[in-house]
């Protein structure tokens, strides 16, 4: 009698375990078959580049500051528009533009720029805080997290929690002059030159 009871309890326990696994109790964000999800720090490692000594008459090499913020709870596409807005501006002009923007990403980028500005003075021997301009400013796709979206009639779907990265590069000195917009004649000349540069593949 005791053996029969134990067998029934064991069968119920196995069924319960199978039910939990089928319902997906384990977090799906930790179940993957891809490569390692370790975050690459290539952007920050550019701050550690050591250049060879300069010649006596050579002009001084401007300081370059690489900074970023990762896993921001924001869309990479919305962040890209703000990143492109301040590209090529001086640091003060970029901060002024972001100050009067009501978007969530603008305040995040402003915090990153202030951190990079402090880093320039503290770690890269930049004398004047305002003598910087944004050479590169872009966003990237972060690590998305999968979650369950509950539907009616006991059904469900999979939704993604989106995250993004923001990267910025500051360079010491005044910003370069803006490029003049291309005219229709310039576009036509470039198109004709591309046609002339065509080659026939697998030919002599």
Curated annotation (Swiss-Prot):
Q: Which Gene Ontology BP terms does the record give?
A: translation
Transit peptide segment? 1-38
| Record flagged with keyword Ribonucleoprotein | yes
Localization in the cell: Mitochondrion
Q: What keywords sit in the KW lines? A: Mitochondrion, Ribonucleoprotein, Ribosomal protein, Transit peptide
Coiled-coil features, chain-numbered ranges: none
Provide an example Pfam family for this protein: Ribosomal_L22
Q: Which GO terms describe its cellular component?
A: mitochondrial inner membrane; mitochondrial large ribosomal subunit; mitochondrion
Q: Which InterPro entries match?
A: Ribosomal_uL22, Ribosomal_uL22_bac/org-type, Ribosomal_uL22_sf
Kindly report the protein's main subcellular placement as a broad class.
mitochondrion
Q: Which domain of life is it from?
A: Eukaryota
Per the UniProt entry, the signal peptide is: none
A single MF term (Gene Ontology):
structural constituent of ribosome
Q: Identify the PANTHER family for this entry.
A: CHLOROPLAST 50S RIBOSOMAL PROTEIN L22-RELATED, LARGE RIBOSOMAL SUBUNIT PROTEIN UL22M
- Subunit notes for this chain? Component of the mitochondrial ribosome large subunit (39S) which comprises a 16S rRNA and about 50 distinct proteins.
So what family is this one in? Belongs to the universal ribosomal protein uL22 family.
User: What's the protein here called?
Assistant: Large ribosomal subunit protein uL22m
Which species does this protein come from? Bos taurus (Bovine)
């Amino acid at each position: 009698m005791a053996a029969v009871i134990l067998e029934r309890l064991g069968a119920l326990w196995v069924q319960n375990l199978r039910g939990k696994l089928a319902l997906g109790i384990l977090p799906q964000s930790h179940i993957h078959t891809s490569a390692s999800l370790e975050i690459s720090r290539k952007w920050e490692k550019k701050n550690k580049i050591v250049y060879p000594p300069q010649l006596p008459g050579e002009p001084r090499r401007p300081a370059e500051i690489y900074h970023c913020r990762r896993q921001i709870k924001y869309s990479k596409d919305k962040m890209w528009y703000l990143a492109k807005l301040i590209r090529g501006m001086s640091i003060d002009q970029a901060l002024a533009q972001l100050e009067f923007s009501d978007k969530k990403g603008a305040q995040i980028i402003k915090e990153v720029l202030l951190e990079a500005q402090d880093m320039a003075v503290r770690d890269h021997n930049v004398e004047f805080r305002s003598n910087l301009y944004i050479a590169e400013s872009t966003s990237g796709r972060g690590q998305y997290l999968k979650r369950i979206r509950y539907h009616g009639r006991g059904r469900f779907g999979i939704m993604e929690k989106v995250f993004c990265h923001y990267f910025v590069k500051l360079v010491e000195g005044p910003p370069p002059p803006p490029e003049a917009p291309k005219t229709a004649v310039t576009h036509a000349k470039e198109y004709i030159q591309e046609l002339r540069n065509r080659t026939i593949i697998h030919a002599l």
